[in-house]
A protein has these predicted regions:
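A detector of tandem-repeat and repeat-rich interaction/domain scaffolds
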Residues: 14-150
Length: 150
């Protein structure tokens, strides 16, 4: 591996080049901003001031954008293929609601230890689970009547 530095847009960039042709580039904060594999596939990332990815694109034409709340939780994302989704989080950062632009929704409920104890979606899937004091799942039940004690 060879490490070099270059200046891009007035900023110092760390470049790692491997013998097989793979290249990684990192910004001044250590965030990976560029990757190229030995087959020529590439991807690029842009970050906000908190180190969260706000824009991603690759050499295959994919492009994604992300927005975050003040706690750093991803709350909105969309891409150049027309897909878009929104997320809500609880005080612990767990995703409790997800909705996409096709109308599909998911809801999650967590216990005080961060274990998912209830799931429901717009396709009619719903289940519940219980955990012991060590976090091990001890009971599972779904809306169709399936039940398992672990």
């Amino acid at each position: 591996m060879k490490v070099t530095y270059e200046i891009e847009n007035g900023k110092k960039i760390k470049v790692k080049t491997y013998v097989d042709g793979t290249v990684f580039k990192y910004d001044e904060n250590g965030n990976k901003i560029y990757y190229k594999d030995n087959d020529g596939n590439e991807d690029w990332k842009e970050y906000d001031s908190n180190g969260k990815v706000i824009h991603y694109k690759n050499s295959n034409g994919r492009e994604d954008w992300y927005e975050y709340d003040s706690n750093g939780n991803k709350i909105h994302s969309w891409d150049n293929r027309g897909y878009e989704y929104w997320q809500e989080h609880d005080a612990n950062g767990n995703v409790i609601h997800l909705k996409d632009n096709d109308g599909y929704e998911k809801w999650y409920e967590f216990d005080a230890n961060g274990h998912c104890i209830h799931f429901k979606d717009t396709d009619g899937i719903e289940w519940w689970s219980e955990h012991d004091a060590n976090g091990n799942k001890i009971h599972f039940k779904d809306i169709n009547g399936y039940e398992r004690w672990c």
